[in-house]
Structures are given as structure tokens and as C-alpha cells.
Amino acid sequence: MTRLPDRAGGGTGAGSGAGTGSGTGPGGAVRGTVGASASASAASSEDGVPPDLLRRFTTAERWVHRASAALMGVAIVTAAFLYLPALAELVGRRRLLVIVHEWSGVLLPLPLLAGLASKAFRADLDRLNRFATYDWRWLSRAVRRVPGPRVSGKFNAGQKLYASFMAGAVLVMLGTGIVMWFPYLTPLVWRTGSTFVHDWLAIFIGVLVIGHIGMAVRDPDARRALRTGFADRRWARREHPLWEKENPPPGE
């Protein structure tokens, strides 16, 4: 089980102890400590998660994201040095850069395939592949920049579209990249078409990844959930209300 941040458990115990032990003297302090522990245990859910937190990602899911992000980052950076003249002049061993780029692209699907061994990861893939009525409403409000809350489940419509596009784009980039890697296995028209698709799709992916990072920079709670695996319940209620309702606090 993923360990909780120390501040979560400490906050619960401190608040309960202060309320229970005040004005009772030395004996009351002991009773307050015991009461704090009992209150913290009662307030926690069955898996040890405090009521003000929600388990958003397991350890396996977080490592899938980290490995995929690392490989994607290497592929994008090496591509930039290979295709932009200003950066290409800075590289002394271009052939080594080509090899790193090729293998980072080939290995990119592996974290996703390894993640399929995780039940939680498969459940999240199922959520990402479902586009409900409220997702269309979320998308409409986002496109028209309508202010106010937008209803979504664990993943909003934007995240679902991003995940679906990136999954398909990685496969296209892998296929076209292999054609470019082994040019003598295919006719000239295939190589020409693959180069065209690979180059333009790479630019589009780069723009999307930059936008994805920009969204994450503006949302510290989302970053914390990816880093620790736990999301603040207030953030979940505001950004993903349907998912928060599926996981009510203990006792409700």
C-alpha cells in the first residue's frame, strides 16, 4: 500500500488531541492523546486513507505515467536537435542522437503494456474510453469558455481526448518511424509518405505536450495527485464532482 503523506495523519491527530485534552490536566493530556488516536482511526477509511483525501492513482499507474513522460520527453528533445538547424549545430555525435531517438520511440508503448498488469490501470483505461453525455457538456462549456463549474468524472473530456489521441499518435509515429528506420524494406512512395506524416505529426504532438505541461503547471493539486497518488477531496469535489461522489467519506 502506498504510504500517506505524514501531514495528513498528523493533522487529524493534532486536531483531535487539542479538542479532547484541553482543560483536563496531566491525566487529560494522556486521555487526549488516546482520544486523538481513536478519532483518527475512526475518521480514516478502511484502507487507511484520511477522509479529506482520495486515492487517485496507484504506484503502478504513477510509474506508467513517469516512464511514458520520460520516453516522450527524450523523443521530443532528440527530434528537436535532429530537425532544427540551430540545435543540430550544437550536436557533435549526430548518429548517437539518432539511435537514442529511435529507441526512445520504439520503447514508448512498453510502459502502457506493462501497466495492463495493474487492475487499477485497466479500470482507468476503461474510464478514459467512455465518453458520456456530461463529457459533451464539459467540452461545450470549455470550447465556449463558459465560466463556472464543469461536471466530470475521474477524468474530464479534455483528458479523455488527449489520452485517446496520444495513444493513436504513438502507434502512427512508431509505424512511420520503423519505415524510416529501415528504408530499404519499403518502396519509395511509402518512405516519402511516412516521412511527411512523421514530421508533421511530431510537431503536433510537441504542441500538445507543451499544452499538457502548461495545464499541469497551473494545477498544483493535479500534480500532487500524480506525485503522491492522493488528491485533496475539496479539489476533487470542484474539478471531478462525479468521481468524488463515487468515493464518499467514511460514514456517509
Indicate residue ranges for each PLM-predicted region.
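Membrane-embedded alpha-helical bundles that constitute the cytochrome b-like, heme-associated redox core
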Residues: M1-G13, G17-T20, T24-E252
